[in-house]
Amino acid sequence: MKSKWILTAALALGTVALTVAQAEPVADSTVTIGRVKVALAESNWEKYPAPSLGIKVASGHGEIRSEAGLLVLRRPDGQVAAAVMLGATWGRSQLSISNSCTMQDGLYVHDFSGGQSQAMECVRAGGPFPTDMLVSQAMPRLKAALEPLSLKLPEVSYPVWLFMANRNASIVMVEGVVAADFVGLPNQTPLGKLPPNLQPMVAAWADTLGATSKQAVNSMSGELAMPTVAFGSSQSAP
């Protein structure tokens, strides 16, 4: 009989110290993080190391094995247009999950599980908000990944949070910010109710990221196709 592990620190910071943070080449617009293979639509992404997820289990038997990476998208002039911390596990035995995908004022929230009590398939998005405030107050994992770097983020951004997990302890987690001229997916409709000020195409983009992340968590291949990240100004990232 397999051991049954209980997820107790989904938001705990990883403990891996980063002493050197250099961009890694993104071969063929694909990166591997944990068991997840992330396909990127754009050619100008960079990957940096990030602290592992550090998800502990209640039984005291250590952590669920995981890996994380910081994905940075630059504009043609070199400015940062998006920064996404993506973490994934390799899975470990059985996982008991409690659903905490609840509505939050001012945010778009969609529960891909349909409200199941023992599932965690949640996407949140909002904004645009001041980026420094977002990262320092609401994105601890992204903040930890950015600390070794000297990156100038967009002043105002759309935030996206994602947590997908199954009972085999296969997990994908995202904390990311995308510049305020982000166009999202204009031809798609959000799956949930929009908060004030959030553009529907941004919520639709978050939904699409959620759907492909859920597929990655539950598939043998672990393939995750990042939706197109495009911008509306003359500074658009190709």
PLM-predicted stretches and their roles:
Residues 1-9:
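Bacterial N-terminal signal peptides that target proteins for export
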Residues 8-17:
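Bacterial N-terminal signal peptides
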Residues 23-112:
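N-terminal Sec/ER secretory leader and immediately downstream segment
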Residues 130-234:
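Short, well-structured beta-strand
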Residues 236-238:
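Short, solvent-exposed mixed-charge patches
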